[in-house]
Amino acid sequence: MADKSFDIVMVGGGSNSLVTAMYLTKFGGLDVGIFEARHELGGGWCTEEPVGGFMANCCSTAMCDWYWEPIKRDIPEWEEYGARVAQSRVGNVVLFSEDQSCLTIYQSNFDPTQELTAREIARFSKKDADTWLWLWDKYKNVWSKYVKEWWWNPAQPFDKQDGLDKLLADPASGADPLWLRMSPMQLYKDLFESIEMRIAFQRPNQSYGINTSEGGGGFHALMNTVFASPNWSYVIGGTHQLAHAAQRVIIENGGKVFTKHPVKNVIIENGKAKGIRLEDGTEIEARKAIITEVNPSQLVHNMIGKEHLSEKIVRRVDNLESWFINITWYTWCLKERPHYLAEKFNPDCGEGATCLIMADREDEDYMVKDNIERQLGRRPSKLNLTTVAHGWHKDDLLAPEGIDFNILTEQFFLPDYLLTDKEWKEFEKTHAEEVIELWQKYAPNMTWDNVIGFNPITPHYTANFAKNFGPAGNWGVIDMCASQMGRCRPIPELASHRTPIKNLYGNGAAWHPMPGAHGMQGYNCYKILSEDLNLKKPWKEKGAPW
C-alpha cells in the first residue's frame, strides 16, 4: 500500500514542471504532488546572492518578450505574484577590437520599426541595413504567427504539418528552403555582405545553443537572430522570482510540494505507471499520471528501466549529444559599470545595453574554430566572450541602490566530465583572470579594483546543481543540433511527451521544441494531458490560436 497518493505525481520541480503543475491545479482541478531532490523548486529559474544585495542568476538570465506569452494570458496572477520582466534600450552590441567601433541592435520597445538599428547597420553596409529591415518585416508580419504555432503546440508527427512547415510553404514568408540545410555561418554569408554583420550573430547563436558551423541549423539561427536580438528582457528581482510566483499559484490551487525528496524510480505494473519510489523506499501512488522532468537518459535507465523499452529507443537515447552547450556564467558585482571605448562610436553601447559581444573583424570564422576545438575535447584557444547586463534602475532589485545593475560574462567551455574536481577549482580562478584581462581591452576601468566579488558558474557547477544537467553540465540538458530540435527532440519516439509506458510522460528542456526557460515544454505537456485526461483547454475557451 502506498504511503501517499495523488492524482498527478511529478518527478522534479524544474521550470517546466511548475508550468504544467499550474495548469493541472488551476484548470484540471487535480491533486498534484511535486517531488524535488533539491532544497527548492525552479531548476534553471535560479538565483543566488554572492555579495550582499547583488542577485546572480545561475542559469537562465536573458529572456525575450515572447517568453511565457500564453501562460501569462491564461494565468495572469502568475505575473502579479512576481513573474515580472523589464527591458533596456539596447539588445545586442558587437564590439570590434581593431578600432573600438560597434554594431548596435536596439530593443523593439525603444525601436519598434528597427529603423534606428538599420541606421547603425548602414554605418557598415547600406545593403545589410535593408536586409535587416526586410527580415524584421517578415518576422513581424509573417514568421511570428507560424513560429509561435510551432513553439506553443506539442511536436507533430512527420506526416502532419507543424508551424515551421507552414512557414516554409507560405510564399509570403520569403524563406529560402536552402536555409534549412545551411549552417548558420553559411546563411549569414548568403544574407549579408559586410564582415560586421556576418560576425554579429555568430556568438549569440552559441548562447542560444546553436552550433555556428553545423549544417541544418541555419534557419533556426536566423529565427533566433531576429526574434531575440531586439527583444531581450530580464526578470525583476532575479529569475528565481518565476519559481516563487509559480509555487504560489500551485499551492493556492491545492498542489503540494516536497523538496529534498529524491525519486529512485517509477513503479511499473503490466505496462502502466502506477507510482514512484523515493530513494528512502517511500512509495507514492499516482492515480492518473506521472510526469518526469529528468533528462532522457535518466528517464530510460533510472525511472523506467531499459527492460521496459525497445532496443531502438534505448540506443537513440544513449546516442544523444550533449557536449556543445556547456557554459561558464560569471556574475560580476562591480563598483561602477564598465566604460567602453566604443561609447565614442555610439554612446548607447554602454549603460542600457543587454548583450555585448567582443569580436575581431579579421577572424570571421572564429566560432568555427572554437566549436572544432571543443568538439575535440580541447580548451578554446581564445576567449569568445559576451557580457549580459541587467538592471540600470533601482526598481529592478538586482543590485544595491546606487549601483542598480549586474553583469554576467559568458564563455563556452568543455563538458564537466573532461576535467577533474581539482582542475575545475583551478579553472574558476584562472578564467576570472582571463576575463578581466580581455575586458580591460574594451573597457579600461575593468580592473580588479572595480570588482567587489563574482559568482563563478561552470559546467562542473551546473552538472552538480541538478542531476538532469549531467553528466556534461549542459544548460540545455541535451544539445540543439539539427537532429535534436523540434519533433526530433529528444528523439521522435518521445517528442510528444508520451512514453511507451501508459500514464507516464516526459517533460523538460530536452523536449520539443528547443531548450530555454520559456516554459514551452511545460505548456505543451499540459496540452497532451488535457487530451488524454479530458481536462479544460483555456486557450480554446479564449479563442486563442495556440
What feature does the model see in each segment?
Residues S194-G209, K382-V388, N445-H512:
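A glycine-rich dinucleotide-binding beta-alpha-beta segment and adjacent secondary-structure elements
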Residues E98-E214:
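Rossmann-like flavin
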Residues K264-L398:
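Mid-domain catalytic core of redox enzymes
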Residues I268, D532-W546:
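Active-site-proximal substrate-binding core of FAD-dependent oxidoreductases
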Residues S125, R337-P338, L376, K425-H460:
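Flavin-binding catalytic cores
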Residues A509-S530:
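A conserved FAD-binding loop/helix module that cradles the flavin
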Residues M223-A273, R277:
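Helical element adjacent to the flavin cofactor pocket in flavoenzyme catalytic cores
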